[in-house]
From Swiss-Prot:
Residues 41-50 have a biased composition (Gly residues). Gene3D superfamilies: Homeodomain-like, lambda repressor-like DNA-binding domains. Residues 138-212 form the POU-specific domain. InterPro entries: HD, Homeobox_CS, Homeodomain-like_sf, Lambda_DNA-bd_dom_sf, POU, POU_dom, POU_domain_TF. Keywords: Cytoplasm, Developmental protein, DNA-binding, Homeobox, Isopeptide bond, Nucleus, Phosphoprotein, Transcription, Transcription regulation, Ubl conjugation. Residues 302-313 have a biased composition (Low complexity). POU5F1/OCT4, SOX2, MYC/c-Myc and KLF4 are the four Yamanaka factors. When combined, these factors are sufficient to reprogram differentiated cells to an embryonic-like state designated iPS (induced pluripotent stem) cells. iPS cells exhibit the morphology and growth properties of ES cells and express ES cell marker genes. A motif (9aaTAD) lies at residues 4-12. Pfam families: Homeodomain, Pou. Transcription factor that binds to the octamer motif (5'-ATTTGCAT-3'). Forms a trimeric complex with SOX2 or SOX15 on DNA and controls the expression of a number of genes involved in embryonic development such as YES1, FGF4, UTF1 and ZFP206. Critical for early embryogenesis and for embryonic stem cell pluripotency. This is POU domain, class 5, transcription factor 1.
Amino acid sequence: MAGHLASDFAFSPPPGGGGDGPGGPEPGWVDPRTWLSFQGPPGGSGIGPGVGPGAEVWGLPACPPPYDFCGGMAYCAPQVGVGLVPQGGLETPQPEGEAGAGVESNSEGASPEPCAAPAGAAKLDKEKLEPNPEESQDIKALQKDLEQFAKLLKQKRITLGYTQADVGLTLGVLFGKVFSQTTICRFEALQLSFKNMCKLRPLLQKWVEEADNNENLQEICKAETLVQARKRKRTSIENRVRGNLESMFLQCPKPTLQQISHIAQQLGLEKDVVRVWFCNRRQKGKRSSSDYSQREDFEAAGSPFPGGPVSFPLAPGPHFGTPGYGGPHFTTLYSSVPFPEGEAFPSVSVTPLGSPMHSN
């Protein structure tokens, strides 16, 4: 029987069993479950009291079933000693022939058996990997339709004399949402995403219909262009005018409405421009004065930590200090509250710890 066993497991009967020679066969590696479940030959002394002692007799926990290691699913790879002991427990003895057959069958199967995946998961993966042919055909048809509409939009816009910016402003007049020139340009060049192209398509379709039917659409577009230009006009003040405003601010930081009108008339500016400039200048003065006062207070107070550093002993425990010095370790900390001179912390006794390798 020994010739049929694998090299990893060579069955050796427990002490007290029979053998061919005086010393019996050479000892080899034995599965512990086979050793515990072995009863011994008839008439010979067993390895424990009773018939077929199990793991409970030797004080060892019972081995869990193989499927407990896999979360309730059967393990597909070959397991060592599965055929040696029954799954129900380790107390039932097993004949020597059956144990050897179990070892032989498991040792010969070198490659693990593949686990069978659940049918539902395999079906879902297959549906994800294989696209629906009907959906792909619909997407291709929509893409072709968008390409044709983009060409039609560009031709209609150029024929009627609209720019891309005019189209965006007209959409704002018709639907309440203004689109930029870049968006219209990217739509005509098919550079937008498929999702954004589909969202913008119905709005542009309505614009084409309005451009064909409404003759006043271009006049509305021009009026909207003027309104957009008036909304935001950046004010630029010359250096000479800014210097005059600065000198007037030093004389009167908060002028009245009559004074603002007089200043605007002298400098040739609008009243709103002068009023906003004085308001911004006052805010700037408040920020600069507050920063200056905080800096003066900080310099007058001096160092926030008088009295120098204060040393606090660390909590007892292993610390990495200089080797060879067994004194207590201290760390230098700074307290936000100044301590009067003469006061000191009560002495704290810290027992130096020895090396953990040589401790008793």
